[in-house]
Amino acid sequence: MEAKSESTQASESWSSHPVYARYWQHYHQAMAWMRSHQSAYQKAVESVVTSPWYYPATDLAQSPAAKGGTSPKSRSKSPSASGDACRRRSRPGKPGPQRRSTEKPARFAEDNDSESDDCGIVCDLSNMVITDELRQYFAETEQHREELRRQHQLDAARLKDYVNADHGLYCDKRGRSTLPPTERPGERRQAEMKRLYGASAAKIQAMETAMQLSFDKHCDRKQPKYWPVIPLKF
């Protein structure tokens, strides 16, 4: 019992350390937000269910209209209208619901045609004035779009050169080539060293070469891996 109490006290002391105070603050805020979200969702569902306009799917399936019966409004129609409806239902191969479904798209098509005609009158852009501010806005929008496109290209190129953490430090994703070199090995580096250090270029290059050889020796012996860097992309 004493060992168990000591272990619980150790865990409590670890979690109540002042270093983790900010973490627990964020944790409690997130839990409070989650509870308020669940409460709001439950209230919304209850308000929809208790609404007088809410009809479950089972009620709609059992309604007289779904079964092919007549609604109270249709009962108040004249006998001639009801007789016409009966004659339409008595025709073979042309039931009533299918006729209603064919009439409704035609009516919607007429409404859409009338709305499109109205929009053609309202959305007349022949007399639209393009100001300097509008031109500047279009130019800035195009510039931002071009910058975003270039940024996407750079991200894609950087992603191709990305090396996973399970590879070593000398992982070459481009692969080896059997073609002869286009220039002498070390010629470009030697010219760069001479441009940077002048007369002392040979001595400094020898020191860098010795340091690089020592680094390669330790890498071959230890075989280190890359430290995993996980980017956060929201």
Curated annotation (Swiss-Prot):
Disulfide-linked positions: none
Basic and acidic residues: compositionally biased ranges: 100-110
Coiled-coil positions: 130-153
One of the protein's GO biological processes: spliceosomal snRNP assembly
Region called Disordered, residue ranges: 60-116
A GO cellular-component term linked to this record: cytosol
Subunit (UniProt): Part of the core SMN complex that contains SMN1, GEMIN2/SIP1, DDX20/GEMIN3, GEMIN4, GEMIN5, GEMIN6, GEMIN7, GEMIN8 and STRAP/UNRIP. Part of the SMN-Sm complex that contains SMN1, GEMIN2/SIP1, DDX20/GEMIN3, GEMIN4, GEMIN5, GEMIN6, GEMIN7, GEMIN8, STRAP/UNRIP and the Sm proteins SNRPB, SNRPD1, SNRPD2, SNRPD3, SNRPE, SNRPF and SNRPG. Interacts with GEMIN6; the interaction is direct. Interacts with GEMIN7; the interaction is direct. Interacts with SMN1; the interaction is direct. Interacts with GEMIN4; the interaction is direct.
UniProt name for this protein: Gem-associated protein 8
Protein source organism: Bos taurus
Gene (name only): GEMIN8
